[in-house]
């Protein structure tokens, strides 16, 4: 079933500009991020446009089209800590030496990891320091 979903995203949604531009904002940082890093399969210009339309700070966008790739390969050395809502992405970054925190969502509720529940700078700093102390 997952491979069918992946094929449909690649074949259909990757070309649907309106789909990508109308995604709802689920989290908003209370700080200016160093960069954005995504594995979206859409045109990178659409991601930049979505960020602009939704009032996000203008920062570099690093986009990886290979879904099994490691985001750390693109951004290691550019950020102090990486936050993602994908367990796989967080684990790959951590194994590569890039500190990473898991964003708490319905999909990640059962994973007992170092998490953040918002993109609040103070919460991220606390979670990062806790992770560095105990990981």
Describe the role of every protein-language-model region:
Residues 2-36, 40-50:
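Short, acidic loop-to-helix structural element flanking the phosphoryl-transfer center
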Residues 61-66, 115-127:
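Short acidic-hydrophobic, aromatic-tinged amphipathic segments that line or gate anion-handling sites
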